[in-house]
């Protein structure tokens, strides 16, 4: 698989129970690299190395290969989320020490969880993402009508050129044969090989 010991994502997920009943869970991985996170901390790893300190392994709470903000702790409806977050965050430091991890990183958490993190004297690292937002456009024409005439004309010209001699077929469910999956994997791996000399994050499995 793509997320396992063999790919450097060793599962260490946390489950909280009350009287034998699960009430909360948090994804957690012990990692020996920084790939697949879309948060680039290689400069931190280099700084650790230059000072003779081990940066890996590290603990990471994240949805692998998904740079999207969202919940990172699943909590039962009847349970106080603030209490659960405090319990998990208080114990994460001891778990990092137990497993020999240099640090714990929670990637793209929801904003409410950030307040709990700050209360535990943990550091915040701010990144920047650029998002396109739909300002009540009903279709693509509505969107490009907001462009200046010259830019709109150039965009339409570029779109026409990009689709010349190209046929697009949409496949769903059982229409996607093993051969198509094999082709998709080969294209995926070739793209990464051209980009950075690796095979990418996802495996055939």
Predicted segments, located by residue:
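A gly/proline- and charged-residue-enriched helix-loop-helix capping module
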Residues: 41-86
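Long, well-ordered alpha-helical scaffolding segments within enzyme catalytic domains
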Residues: 87-92
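A conserved beta-strand-loop-helix scaffold within acyl/acetyltransferase catalytic domains
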Residues: 1-55, 93-205
């Amino acid at each position: 698989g793509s997320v396992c010991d063999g790919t450097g994502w060793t599962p260490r997920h946390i489950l909280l129970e009350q009287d034998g009943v699960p009430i909360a869970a948090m994804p957690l991985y012990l990692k020996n690299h920084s790939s697949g996170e879309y948060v680039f901390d290689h400069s931190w790893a280099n700084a650790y190395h230059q000072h003779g300190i081990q940066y890996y392994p590290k603990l990471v709470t994240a949805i692998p290969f998904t740079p999207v903000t969202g919940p990172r702790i699943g909590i039962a409806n009847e349970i106080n989320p603030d209490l659960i977050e405090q319990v998990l965050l208080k114990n994460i430091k001891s778990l990092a020490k137990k497993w020999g991890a240099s640090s714990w990183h929670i990637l793209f958490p929801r904003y409410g969880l950030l307040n709990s993190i700050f209360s535990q004297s943990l550091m915040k690292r701010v990144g920047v993402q650029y998002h396109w937002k739909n300002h009540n456009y009903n279709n693509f024409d509505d969107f490009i009508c907001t462009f200046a005439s010259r830019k709109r004309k150039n965009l339409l010209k570029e779109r026409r050129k990009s689709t010349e001699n190209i046929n697009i077929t949409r496949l769903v469910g059982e229409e996607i044969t093993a051969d198509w999956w094999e082709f998709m994997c080969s294209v995926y791996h070739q793209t990464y090989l051209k980009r950075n000399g690796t095979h990418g994050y996802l495996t055939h499995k």
